[in-house]
Amino acid sequence: MILVDMNQISVASVMMHLHMTKQTKPDEDMVRHMILNSLRMYRMRFCDEYGELVLCYDSKHYWRRDYYPEYKHNRKKGRESSANDWDAIFAVLNAVKSELKEFFPYKHLEVYGAEADDIIAALCGELEFDNGKTLILSGDKDFIQLQKYRNVTQYSPITKKFVNGVDPDDYLSEHVLKG
């Protein structure tokens, strides 16, 4: 199973497009093309070894905000100070997400209150004793801790490399201590 952190793939596609075009508002057709092409490329590269793609999305509401209202507050402040048209960006990403869900054969997971990270972590734990391999498609280093499961590997679309070389338990301990 290939667990795709779709928020990272989607936002990276938009940011690359805006950077290359020097625009602040995305071209929906180009962003759609970039996202679909990325998914096609990863499917072709990894499906024989890992199986089907499962697109994992963040919910609009995070349960962590119920307990810590400042959760990811700096991202919001960063968007407010950005020249990019974030309303247009989110409109394009939501349109592409709806199209992927309605017209494409990929499994689509979005759980109210959960982030894609939560979904991916839960699936890795559930699939630990499955005979298949699990690939996490994300550059988020927090996923290193999930490599404690014998069948989990991670590939970063950003660096275009497998993420490894760090002991998952040491990584988790270090980040707990750092806060």
Where are these regions (language model features)?
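Domain-level signal for Mg2+-assisted phosphodiester chemistry and nucleotide/NA-binding surfaces
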Residues: 1-98
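Extended two-metal-dependent nuclease catalytic cores across DNA- and RNA-processing enzymes
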Residues: 49-50, 77-179
